[in-house]
Regions:
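Short, Lys/Arg-enriched N-terminal segments with co-localized hydrophobic residues
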Residues: 3-17
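An extracytoplasmic/periplasmic, membrane-proximal ligand-sensing/linker region
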Residues: 13, 45-49, 194, 261, ...
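N-terminal secretory signal peptides and thylakoid transit peptides that target proteins
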Residues: 16-33
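N-terminal (or domain-start) structured segment
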Residues: 43-132, 173, 197-222, 233, ...
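Hinge/capping helix and adjacent helix->loop/strand transition within the periplasmic-binding protein
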Residues: 100-106, 121-210, 259, 272-305
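A ligand-binding cleft/hinge motif common to bilobed small-molecule-binding domains
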Residues: 114-125, 191-195, 222-256
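C-terminal lobe and pocket-closing loops
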Residues: 142, 230-298, 327-330
Length: 345
């Protein structure tokens, strides 16, 4: 079933670094100690306000992470924090905006790994350099992807292989949506179709929620996106989750089998969200923002709130985030080449 995919199993994205850093955080720094340490710092340079820039539509996973952290961002970093959604070009508009912002810490990027680790392999003229134009601050949360289908697909279809079989019989309806062309969900769907020898047509959207709305409205058959983005629609019975992308069943979706369980051994993926500042941001600003983000992510309200969207908090140091990005960028190159994606495609 996996004929034509890379010979060696593709490791889950970043899971090695993510699991270790989160364990280290939990073991080495409790929330109370962290907050106490922050309270002892001098906050004379606290900003009047800060903007967290998210590159996808309101209601999606990126928006959720941004708003949860903004609500709890330690007041020592900024007296207030707001979220601005700058959609377009698969998240590139948001990154360009932050790239050209003043490096004073007032403009913060929240982005999934895809925009920084995958796009360099898929766009010949990417308008930013993920390493040269941005300063890593902290990872925020880790999540897995899900494959869901809407009313276009018969209720008898309950698994990914059954979906592919239905697509073979109904080639005109064999399609799926993703939050952006060249994103991880795009490639997961493409690899799934390739593994099942199905011509699965991709439809790119500006975020997962617009794709889901078209799916539950019967305009497209399926959507591949962060599993948490489907939660409210699953609860309302408007769509069905056929598979998740983790190496093991998800903490928040224990009843849904993974793609690897269903025979697609190479399709095991997780992804992270990370906070970045513009290049040349002063180190004291980077460290203060890192401390503020860690404090926010240590809040039980944030932990519980992100869990509603199937997200697990995962704060890191700036160096850990930089290492994760480097590893994922290197890992995605061969996979993108295997799919044969081009910017025009």
């Amino acid at each position: 079933m996996t004929q034509g995919l890379p010979a060696q199993p593709f490791n889950p994205i970043g899971i090695h670094a993510m699991t270790l850093s989160r364990r280290q955080f939990i073991q080495s720094s409790g929330a109370s100690a962290l907050l106490a340490g922050i309270g002892r710092q001098a906050w004379a340079q606290a900003l009047d306000s800060a903007k967290i820039i998210a590159g996808f539509a309101p209601g999606g996973t990126a928006d959720t992470v941004s708003r949860r952290v903004a609500d709890k961002l330690h007041p020592g970093y900024a007296k207030s924090a707001v979220v601005e959604n700058k959609t377009g070009a698969g998240g590139q508009i948001a990154i360009q905006f932050v790239k050209t912002a003043a490096p004073d810490g007032a403009t913060v990027l929240l982005t999934p790994m895809s925009m920084l680790g995958i796009y360099p392999h898929t766009y010949k003229k990417l308008p930013y350099d993920p390493v040269a134009d941005l300063t890593p601050v902290s990872a925020a949360a880790v999540f897995e992807y899900g494959l869901a289908v809407g009313p276009m697909v018969p209720a008898s279809v309950k698994t990914a292989p059954e979906f592919l079989a239905w697509c073979k019989v109904n080639p005109a309806l064999a399609n799926f949506g993703s939050p952006a062309a060249g994103s991880a969900p795009h490639f997961i769907g493409a690899l799934l179709g390739r593994a099942g020898n199905v011509d699965l047509r991709h439809v790119a959207f500006r975020g997962t929620q617009p794709a889901i709305l078209d799916m539950i409205g019967g305009q497209i058959a399926a959507v591949c996106g962060p599993s948490g983005d489907f939660s409210q629609h699953l609860a309302a019975g408007k769509c069905r989750l056929l598979a998740t992308s983790g190496g093991v069943r998800g903490k928040f979706t224990p009843g849904t089998p993974t793609l690897t369980e269903q025979g697609f051994r190479d399709l095991a993926f997780t992804e992270w969200f990370g906070f970045f500042l513009p290049a040349r941001a002063p180190q004291d600003v980077v460290q203060r923002l890192n401390s503020g983000i860690r404090a926010a992510l240590a809040s039980q309200d944030v932990i519980d709130g992100l869990a509603l969207s199937y997200l697990e908090v995962m704060p890191t140091s700036p160096a850990q985030l930089a290492a994760m990005l480097k590893s994922d960028t290197e890992r995605w190159g061969p996979l993108v080449k295997a799919v044969g994606f081009t910017p025009e495609g």
